[in-house]
Amino acid sequence: MVEEPTIAVYDSQSHEYHRAFQVFLDHTDQKLKAQKWLTDLIDRLPSRRVFIDAGAGNGKVTAWFTERFGRTITIEPNASLRSELKRDCPAAEVVPERILDAKVGAAGDLILCSHVFYYIDASEWLPNLQRLVSWLSSSGVLVLVVQNHDTDCMRMLEHFFGRRFLLASFARQFQKGCGESYQVRVETVPAQVETADFASAYTIAEFMLNLLPISDPPARGALEEYVGAHFARPQGSFRFSCDQDFVQIWRRG
């Protein structure tokens, strides 16, 4: 009996991950909308001395904002991503550690943690969040960026693995648990993936499923059927939502 092919499984250090991520970037407005939202926030900051990018990846997002701050500190444990980070952000200080192990030695006016919590086990969300807010300056803001739980992508994740990411709800629980020492605000910004061909839509869907560790990958045919049934448009293109939550946390005055 021939086994049915399964979806590809890869980690964030692999060539396959980077290739699929680029296909995603080429077919979404998510990053441009994030850039605009963050630019508007930075314009309103009372101080722009220190920018901390926790989980900076390859530095593409970091590079948008380094010139807006007097000092930029990046945290990135992935060696392959760090090489790109150093190339694209030569003026930034690079801390090659996980968030929980990092020592930054500065208070951040903006601390950004963008699409990182997917890769952190839920049991470690609280200590990671506590570490991040401990780096805030008195007037600083922490921004956690994560895909909204009610997008087409998250519904697909729940369909195949029974899970969605509920970071915004977790942040509100954190606020209550801290005796209201922190203010939390969540803003959802719509975003879409749109492709003209099935192959790109499938690659992006497969990439989204790889946000979680996959011990028992679903059949490739099952994902192909899902993409066709849920994301296909009448004119032959494919569209699915990937709205972002911008979770803002700052100290109460």
Range-by-range predicted roles:
Residues 112:
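A conserved beta-strand element that flanks and buttresses the S-adenosyl-L-methionine
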Residues 1-46, 48-57, 141-168:
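Conserved class I S-adenosyl-L-methionine
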Residues 163-179:
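Short alpha-helix
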Residues 184-253:
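Conserved Class I S-adenosyl-L-methionine
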Residues 57-101:
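Class I SAM-dependent methyltransferase SAM/SAH-binding core
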Residues 120-131:
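A short, conserved alpha-helix within the catalytic core of class I
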